[in-house]
Amino acid sequence: MNVQEALNLLKENGYKYTNKREDMLQLFADSDRYLTAKNVLSALNDDYPGLSFDTIYRNLSLYEELGILETTELSGEKLFRFKCSFTHHHHHFICLACGKTKEIESCPMDKLCDDLDGYQVSGHKFEIYGTCPDCTAENQENTTA
């Protein structure tokens, strides 16, 4: 998904174009990580000083409903990112320190299906959490300094 595809999808579903919506979508396009509503508000606050959490959440929910954004939850907080445009099946590693994601090509369901004989699986989501190499290196530098 990219910004133009997302804007077209909004238009096709009867939602009007606004600079605010485009800027919010651009924020996700420029990020390789999951973002919280607070991240979005902080990033857009200078350009839109009266922007509220309600407006942010309403748009994030709309984007999720239309399949523009995908979500995950960490420590009880919902995080958002552009829906992957990859056409192949994959999963993600998510850095708990910075939110950056890395695509994982292999799928554990390939091995688990044998254990689910007779069950009809309708879908699955697999995420691995930890610390990315950049954050690990930064953490090691901070502890040795």
Swiss-Prot record:
Keyword rRNA processing: no
InterPro entries: FUR (IPR002481), Fur_C (IPR043135), WH-like_DNA-bd_sf (IPR036388), WH_DNA-bd_sf (IPR036390)
Effect recorded for C95S: Lack of repressor activity
One annotated GO biological process: negative regulation of DNA-templated transcription
Activity regulation, per record: Sequentially activated from an inactive dimer (Zur(2):Zn(2)) to a partially active asymmetric dimer (Zur(2):Zn(3)), and finally to the fully zinc-loaded active form (Zur(2):Zn(4)). Binds a maximum of 4 Zn(2+) ions per dimer.
Bilayer-spanning residue ranges: none
Annotated phenotype, changing C132S: Strong decrease in repressor activity
Keywords annotated in UniProt: Cytoplasm, DNA-binding, Metal-binding, Repressor, Transcription, Transcription regulation, Zinc
GO molecular function list: DNA-binding transcription factor activity; DNA-binding transcription repressor activity; transcription cis-regulatory region binding; zinc ion binding
Effect of D110A: Does not affect repressor activity
Result of altering H92A: Decrease in repressor activity
Record's keyword annotation contains Ligase: no
UniProt effect for mutating C135S: Strong decrease in repressor activity
GO cellular component: cytoplasm; protein-DNA complex
Superkingdom assignment: Bacteria
Localization per Swiss-Prot or TrEMBL: Cytoplasm
Pfam families per the UniProt record, alphabetical: FUR
Record's subunit section: Homodimer.
Described function: Acts as a negative controlling element, employing Zn(2+) as a cofactor to bind the operator of the repressed genes. Required for the zinc-specific repression of two operons implicated in zinc uptake, yciC and ycdHIyceA. Also represses the expression of rpmE2, the gene for ribosomal protein L31B, which is expressed only after the end of exponential growth.
Written domain comment of the UniProt record: Contains 3 zinc-binding sites. Site 1 has a structural role and site 2 is the Zn(2+) sensing site. Site 3 residues do not bind metal ions with a physiologically relevant affinity, but contribute to dimer stability.
Family membership noted in the UniProt record: Belongs to the Fur family.
The protein, known as: Zinc-specific metallo-regulatory protein
Lineage: Bacteria, Bacillati, Bacillota, Bacilli, Bacillales
Gene name in the database record: zur
